[in-house]
């Protein structure tokens, strides 16, 4: 029993043990089953993932096939483009060859033309020789006829006087005488035979002469025919040469045009090829990335296979002792570490899925095809274009998501613009339409893993080749706006001079690379060594893969930068931009902008809690809209611009130490580059300080960081006074460099954009100045431009963009069009905008910028106006509407806060409807120089009239020339210690309806001038110096004879005498009040300035010589006179009237003005009337100054229209003065008269004033210039010559008679179809002239008549007849005819007939003179008065003068002992005319000479400065040469005495200026 119990007890214990083991086994089996279920579920999920991966691989393969197909298409299009390029090159070579052939043909034709011209010259020479031979033959024929007549008369006389004498001697018985009839018959037979023989002889001679004459006529006709044929051939050859020249010009223009066209097409195709190559390279890189990712996926799959094998081994190794230990670890370790490996692989798969988003983008290829197809379809593709084609910006890119269709890609934007969309908010990115002259900055954003999967991997390649093309078409422009949306910054790189500094911590990099991975030290450690080693291998592979990716990207960057450097070396470097990378905190948004010039002192401020960037920016760009809306910064942007940084920083050679200039005004020159490194927490920050070349763009979208950013200490740049001027000047100078060939129009706009924010701390503002330089064409389709070709000036319009679209409190800067169309190429406009200084004091919505305008023009006029909007009536607004995508701007009449009333502000509001509204406040301030009184004219007119003129003069004084200052100083001096005093009395002020203001003032000026201050030798500098010296000598002589008291100054209180010179000859300096020219403001009004003055001064005799270069005035202090001047300025012309009256001891002065509307008579005074009219279409200056000595009776009669009746008065001087105003005519008349005691004078003048008297000298010069008439001039110089009669006529319309006086008158009148009229002298002549050219002569003993007849019409026919008669007692006067003359004994007659027709240029002249005399007179030529010159004393010399190409031949005799010169001025034609007149007190003595015709050519000179004005139609001027080449030859055919010689003088066509101060007196 006991054994059984023991046995059963042991069994029971065993059963209990077995039950416990069974329970444990069942629990273990259940647990393993649960684990198996989990493993099966995991395997099923892995299999489903592999299935999805296989599907993705199929999609990848499909898209790769499509990409290959597109690549093939691109290769085919590239081959086609190359074929077209080769065809164009061949065509260009063909055109060049044709151009060479055309040049060869032209040279051959030029040679032929030269040969024909030489033949023509030879034919002309032969014709001249034949004509000379003909003349000689005719002369010989006349001589033979005369000899024949003499012989006939001799024979007749001999026959008549024939007598016979007979003598007979009767030595023998006388023979029977012959019969008388036989003797008579024999003699008759003898005489008849001799008569027949002589008649036969003479008939033979006459027949021979007739035959010779016939042959001469035939030869002459033949020569004329040959000359005519040669002329026709020459004309045909000339026309042919002209046609060939035109053809050559057309061919050259066509060649240039086709060359430009083909060059543009080649550039466009090369651009397309470059873009396609860039896309190909981008595809290659993308495919390499895909392969690399595929390799990584294979590695991950291998790792998963190893894990599956590990689990399988765990299942099979249940009996292994390590199971217990592994189980305990499983039970103790929490669930979270086990999911770490799952999350790791999940993140890896997520990264792969994100990269799988790439093949979904196919729109860039359509855009590329569109761009390549639209290159030839753009309407302005041959014009000046501006397109920025981004080259390699798509190498890494073509960046978009599956929602890239939401990014607008229109035909007016750049076809290859990169738009980045975020899958988190699906907001498209607006492209940047800025004019980026350099390449876009490369931006890389390392991917992240956030809760929202599928964020695009945005790798934007740097655009290395920035192809800039000129485009007038406003579309097809856009730029790469590469932004990235990311939540955490990854690693950061700062690039300096091609080096990359990469500071990062491993754990930080891991954390940045995947935002969800957390690798903790308590990671799951596998029990098995295999599992642990596998896990470590996976981690190492991941880490090494990250480093390998970074190294690959870095190597790609280096390759790209090397390629960019090569591209920069190949083309001219126009990039002045330095893109600088930004460091922005995690919650902020990064904006990358490319600028041209920056202001100094930009620094990145680093903080441990975050990174912010502050900027002081100066942008030099065109129409750059802010890209703030396109860059939503949830990531860190990495900007790399090594090549441009290297290119610009190579120029920096100065020393460090320029950081302290941060508070100075922005400089436009790069001075120094500094580099600093700041160690941070887990990273190293490198700072580059490039003064004036760096720009940091501040992101203000993050409101949380903006408060801190604006409240911390920011240095504020202040611009005031000279610093602003210096900065603007440097900007303008820098902008104008390299643009000498263009219109230099520079618009500089300075916009201060306040980053105002109501924060808790101190608020400072960074002030970026935006200066925009106007280029020739617009760079963007939305910043629109109008270019007007008519004036050569580019008018720029600046569009505007809201700075932020999502932040209602952000600063909204805008640029309005404030450019006004100017009228000069050299205009420079400055646009200055300054904001409110304290914008934090009012609402944020009312913040904005104020736009000022500074116009600096060539006339030193500054218009300075503050504007925030465009006034409707002043500025033009150019808006494209919805086509350019610009929002309409509406003007809201809402007043805004302005500082001091001088600054307005413009405000833009973003309303709910999306419309951009503007709140304008316009305050203008204009400062005009040199008319500053325009700004305060109200204050001037509000004062008393007595002080108005002085205030106006004070305002004008700084900008006037020195000479005007000196003259105006006499009106403004009021001190008593000076030698003169002035009193200004403004009588009345009148305002006319046309906007002109007449200010009538009386200025009483008395001043004593020392003789040492104004020396008489100053007049020698004038062009009429010799005349003035002669005039002054006469004045000195006349003053020396007069016992006048020492002049006194009437206003001197003490009455002391004025210091006198030797002969009391004093100069009184006249003060002329210069009125400013008519000034036009914007409304077109003319600034009024008008004055009258009456001057009292010790003046009685005044010498005023007006020359083309200036005024020289000298006054003789003798008496008190009065000067009245009236100056009135109207809107369209300036009229200046001067009435200067100088009184002297004269008996009576009577003056009648030209229009007979005014007659003034006074005792002891003479008048001087000056009319000066200055207008846009006419400039008339009429000056007449008359000075008198002791004149008993004086009378003036003027006539401007038609001559009045003849006035004959003994003891009276009659002269006329008048003006001839025209529509466009310049009239200058000057008369200077010096007279001593005058007994009596008489003269009648025409349109110009003349005067003569005994014992006085008068010089009168009248100049008249018209637009088509050239110069018209009249010069009279009268010397004291008794017993002479001077007469002259003008236009053959009036009669001039004067007795007992002598006058030498030279008048030069140049009109389009009327040559010069000359006047001569004849004593004791009574002449009546009418328009019919009828001449009546009443002669008595000793009468000489000279007649000049000029007829002018279209054919320019001139007839001139000179008739000189010397009637002796007992001889009746002969009637004068045109064809024949009957000359009685002791009567000499000279006829000159000059006729110039359309085909005959050389007139024929005949002189027949009666008896030899020793003194001669001058016969004026038909074109100009000849210069008479010679060297023999007492001998009469016939002078032969040839007048250039169109010769006027005449022969005259003159006595070289009595020669006077009269100077005349033809300033506009560039030469001077001098005429010589010969006069003698006794009378005229005409030399006897034969008719002489010498055809002379060549170049010669006359001794002296005699100039001739022969030309045709009053334009051609021929001058004498300065050197003397006088050839004397004895005329063999002269009948005169041996003293008679022939002087040949040649006139060439040189127009030379006569040396100043050399007169023939």
Curated annotation (Swiss-Prot):
Signal peptide: none annotated. Interacts with DES, DMD, DTNA, TLN1, UTRN and VCL. Isoform 1 and isoform 2 interact with GFAP and VIM. Induction: Up-regulated in reactive astrocytes following neurotrauma (at protein level). This is Synemin. The modification Phosphothreonine is found at residue 653. Residues 50-58 are annotated as: Linker 1. Residues 187-300 are annotated as: Coil 2. GO terms for molecular function: intermediate filament binding; protein-macromolecule adaptor activity; structural constituent of cytoskeleton; structural constituent of muscle; vinculin binding. InterPro entries: IF_conserved (IPR018039), IF_rod_dom (IPR039008), SYNM (IPR030634). Residues 601-624, 1222-1231 have a biased composition (Basic and acidic residues). GO terms for cellular component: adherens junction; costamere; intermediate filament; membrane; neurofilament cytoskeleton; sarcolemma; Z disc. It is found in: Cytoplasm, Cytoskeleton; Cell junction, Adherens junction. Residues 1-10 are annotated as: Head. It comes from Mus musculus. Residues 301-1561 are annotated as: Tail. Belongs to the intermediate filament family. Residues 1152-1453 are annotated as: Interaction with TLN1 and VCL. Residues 11-49 are annotated as: Coil 1A. Coiled coil: none annotated. Keywords: Cell junction, Coiled coil, Cytoplasm, Cytoskeleton, Intermediate filament, Methylation, Phosphoprotein. Residues 59-163 are annotated as: Coil 1B. SMART domains: Filament. The modification Omega-N-methylarginine is found at residue 1481. It comes from the Eukaryota. Residues 11-320, 1242-1557 are annotated as: Interaction with DMD and UTRN.
């Amino acid at each position: 029993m006991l054994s059984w119990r023991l046995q059963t007890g042991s069994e029971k214990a065993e059963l209990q043990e077995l039950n416990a083991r069974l329970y444990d086994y069942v629990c273990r089996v259940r647990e393993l089953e649960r684990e198996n279920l989990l493993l099966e579920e995991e395997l099923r999920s892995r299999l489903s993932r592999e299935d999805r991966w296989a599907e993705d691989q199929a999609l990848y393969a499909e898209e790769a096939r499509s990409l290959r197909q597109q690549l093939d298409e691109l290769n085919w299009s590239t081959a086609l483009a190359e074929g077209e390029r080769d065809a164009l090159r061949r065509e260009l070579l063909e055109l060049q060859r044709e151009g060479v052939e055309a040049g060869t043909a032209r040279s051959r034709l030029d040679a032929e033309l030269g040969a024909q011209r030489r033949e023509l010259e030879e034919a002309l020479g032969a014709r001249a020789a034949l004509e000379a031979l003909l003349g000689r033959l005719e002369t010989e024929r006349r001589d033979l006829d005369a000899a024949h007549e003499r012989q006939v008369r001799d024979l007749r006389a001999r026959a008549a006087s024939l007598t016979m004498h007979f003598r007979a001697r009767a030595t023998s018985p006388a023979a029977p005488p012959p019969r008388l009839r036989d003797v008579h018959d024999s003699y008759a037979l003898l005489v008849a035979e001799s008569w027949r023989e002589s008649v036969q002889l003479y008939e033979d001679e006459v027949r021979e002469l007739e035959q010779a004459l016939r042959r001469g006529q035939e030869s002459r006709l033949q020569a004329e025919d040959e000359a005519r044929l040669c002329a026709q051939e020459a004309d045909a050859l000339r026309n042919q040469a002209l046609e060939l020249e035109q053809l050559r010009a057309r061919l050259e223009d066509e060649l240039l045009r086709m060359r430009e066209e083909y060059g543009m097409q080649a550039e466009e195709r090369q651009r397309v090829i470059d873009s396609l190559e860039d896309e190909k390279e981008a595809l290659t890189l993308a495919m390499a990335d895909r392969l690399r990712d595929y390799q990584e996926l294979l590695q991950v799959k291998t790792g998963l296979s190893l894990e599956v094998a590990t689990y399988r081994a765990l299942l099979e190794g249940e009996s292994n002792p390590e199971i217990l230990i592994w189980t305990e670890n499983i039970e103790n370790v929490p669930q979270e570490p086990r999911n770490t490996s799952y999350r790791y692989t999940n993140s890896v798969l997520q990264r792969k899925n994100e990269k799988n988003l790439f093949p979904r983008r196919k729109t860039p290829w359509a855009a590329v095809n569109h761009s390549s197809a639209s290159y030839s379809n753009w309407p302005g593709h041959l014009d000046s274009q501006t397109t920025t084609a981004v080259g390699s910006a798509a190498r890494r890119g073509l960046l978009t998501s599956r929602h890239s269709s939401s990014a607008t890609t229109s035909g007016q934007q750049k076809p290859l613009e990169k738009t980045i969309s975020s899958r988190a908010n699906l907001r498209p990115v607006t492209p940047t339409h800025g004019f980026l002259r350099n390449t876009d900055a490369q931006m890389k954003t390392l991917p992240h893993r956030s809760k929202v999967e599928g964020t695009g991997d945005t790798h934007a390649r740097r655009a290395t080749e920035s192809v800039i093309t000129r485009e007038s078409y406003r579309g097809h422009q856009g730029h790469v706006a590469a932004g990235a949306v990311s939540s955490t910054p990854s690693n950061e790189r700062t690039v300096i001079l091609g080096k990359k500094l990469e500071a990062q911590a491993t754990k930080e990099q891991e954390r940045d690379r995947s935002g969800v991975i957390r690798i903790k030290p308590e990671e799951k450690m596998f029990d098995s060594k295999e599992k642990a080693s596998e896990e470590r291998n996976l981690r190492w592979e991941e880490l090494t893969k990250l480093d390998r990716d970074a190294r690959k990207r870095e190597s790609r960057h280096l390759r790209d930068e090397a390629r960019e450097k090569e591209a920069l070396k190949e083309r001219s470097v126009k990039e002045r931009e330095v893109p600088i990378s930004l460091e922005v905190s995690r919650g902020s948004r990064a904006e990358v902008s490319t600028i041209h010039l920056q202001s100094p002192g930009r620094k990145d401020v680093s903080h441990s809690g975050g990174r912010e960037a502050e900027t002081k920016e100066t942008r030099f760009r065109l129409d750059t809209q802010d890209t703030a809306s396109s860059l939503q910064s949830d990531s860190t942007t990495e900007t790399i611009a090594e090549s441009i940084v290297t290119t610009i920083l190579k120029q920096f050679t100065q020393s460090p130490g320029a950081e302290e200039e941060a508070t100075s005004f922005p400089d436009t020159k790069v001075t120094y580059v500094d580099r600093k490194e700041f160690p941070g927490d887990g990273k190293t920050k490198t700072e580059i300080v490039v003064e004036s070349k760096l720009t940091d763009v501040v992101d203000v979208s993050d409101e949380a960081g903006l408060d801190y950013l604006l409240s911390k200490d920011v240095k504020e740049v202040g611009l005031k006074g000279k610093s602003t001027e210096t900065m603007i000047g440097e900007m303008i100078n820098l902008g104008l460099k390299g643009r000498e060939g263009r219109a230099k129009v520079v618009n500089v706009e300075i916009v201060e954009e306040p980053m105002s924010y109501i924060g808790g701390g101190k608020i400072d503002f960074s002030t970026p100045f935006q200066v925009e330089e106007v280029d020739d064409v617009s760079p963007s389709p939305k910043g629109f431009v109008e270019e007007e070709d008519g004036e050569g000036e580019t008018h720029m319009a600046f569009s505007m963009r809201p700075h932020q679209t999502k932040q209602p409190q952000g600063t909204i800067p805008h640029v309005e069009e404030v450019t006004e169309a100017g009228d000069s190429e050299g205009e420079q406009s400055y646009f200055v905008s300054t904001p409110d200084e304290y914008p934090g004091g009012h609402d944020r919505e009312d913040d904005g910028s104020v736009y000022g305008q500074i116009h600096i023009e060539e006339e030193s006029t500054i218009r300075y106006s503050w504007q925030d909007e465009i006034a409707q009536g002043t500025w033009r607004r150019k808006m494209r509407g919805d086509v350019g995508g610009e929002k309409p701007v509406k003007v809201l009449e809402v007043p805004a806060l302005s500082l001091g009333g001088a600054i307005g502000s413009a405000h833009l509001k973003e309303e709910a409807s999306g419309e951009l509204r503007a709140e304008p406040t316009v305050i203008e301030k204009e400062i005009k120089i040199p008319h500053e009184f325009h700004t305060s004219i109200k204050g001037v007119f509000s004062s008393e009239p007595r002080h108005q003129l002085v205030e106006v003069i004070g305002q004008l004084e700084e900008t006037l020339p020195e000479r005007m200052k000196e003259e105006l100083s006499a009106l403004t001096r009021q001190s008593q210690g000076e030698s003169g005093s002035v009193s200004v009395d403004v009588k009345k002020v009148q305002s006319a309806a046309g906007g002109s203001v007449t200010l009538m003032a009386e200025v009483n000026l008395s001043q004593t001038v020392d003789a040492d201050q104004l020396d008489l030798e100053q007049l020698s500098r004038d062009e009429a110096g010799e005349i003035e010296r002669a005039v002054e000598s006469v004045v000195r002589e006349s003053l020396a004879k007069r016992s006048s008291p020492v002049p006194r100054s009437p206003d001197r209180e003490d009455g002391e005498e004025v210091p006198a010179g030797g002969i009391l000859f004093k100069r009184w300096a006249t003060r002329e009040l210069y009125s400013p020219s008519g000034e036009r403001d914007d409304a077109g009004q003319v600034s009024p300035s008008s004055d009258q003055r009456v001057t009292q001064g010790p003046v009685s005799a005044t010498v005023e010589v007006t020359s083309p270069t200036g005024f020289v005035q000298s006054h003789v202090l003798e008496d008190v006179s009065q000067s009245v001047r009236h100056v009135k300025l109207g809107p369209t012309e300036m009229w200046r009237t001067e009435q200067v009256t100088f009184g002297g001891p004269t008996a009576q002065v009577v003056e009648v003005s030209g229009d007979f509307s005014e007659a003034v008579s006074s005792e002891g005074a003479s008048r001087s009337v000056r009319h000066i009219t200055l207008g846009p279409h006419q400039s008339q200056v009429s000056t007449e100054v008359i000075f008198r000595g002791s004149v008993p009776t004086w009378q003036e009669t003027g006539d401007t229209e038609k001559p009045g009746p003849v006035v004959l008065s003994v003891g009276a001087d009659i002269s006329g003065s008048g003006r001839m105003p025209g529509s466009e005519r310049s009239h200058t008349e000057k008369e200077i008269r010096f007279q001593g005691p005058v007994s009596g004078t008489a003269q009648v003048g025409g349109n110009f004033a003349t005067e003569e008297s005994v014992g006085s000298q008068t010089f009168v010069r009248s100049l008249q210039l018209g637009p088509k008439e050239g110069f018209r001039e009249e010069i009279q110089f009268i010397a004291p010559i008794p017993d002479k009669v001077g007469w002259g006529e003008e236009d053959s319309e009036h009669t001039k008679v004067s007795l007992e006086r002598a006058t030498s008158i030279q008048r030069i009148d140049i009109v389009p179809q009327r040559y010069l009229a000359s006047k001569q002298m004849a004593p004791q002549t009574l002449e009546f002239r009418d328009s019919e050219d009828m001449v009546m002569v009443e002669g008595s003993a000793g009468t000489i008549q000279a007649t000049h007849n000029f007829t002018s019409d279209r054919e320019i026919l001139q007839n001139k007849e000179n008739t000189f008669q010397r009637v002796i007692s007992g001889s009746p006067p002969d009637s004068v005819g045109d064809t024949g003359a009957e000359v009685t004994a002791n009567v000499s007659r000279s006829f000159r007939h000059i006729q110039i027709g359309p085909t005959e240029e050389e007139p024929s002249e005949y002189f027949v003179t009666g008896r030899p005399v020793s003194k001669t007179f001058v016969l004026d030529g038909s074109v100009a008065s000849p210069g008479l010159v010679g060297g023999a004393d007492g001998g009469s010399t016939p002078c032969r003068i040839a007048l250039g190409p169109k010769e006027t031949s005449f022969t005259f005799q003159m006595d070289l002992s009595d020669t006077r010169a009269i100077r005349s001025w033809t300033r506009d034609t560039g030469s001077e005319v001098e005429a010589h007149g010969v006069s003698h007190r006794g009378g005229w003595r005409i030399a006897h000479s034969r008719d002489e015709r010498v055809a002379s050519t060549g170049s010669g000179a006359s001794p002296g400065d005699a100039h001739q004005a022969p030309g045709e139609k009053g334009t051609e001027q021929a001058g004498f040469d300065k050197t003397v080449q006088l050839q004397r030859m004895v005329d063999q055919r002269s009948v005169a005495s041996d003293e008679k010689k022939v002087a040949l003088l040649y006139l060439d066509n040189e127009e030379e200026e006569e040396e100043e101060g050399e007169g023939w007196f």
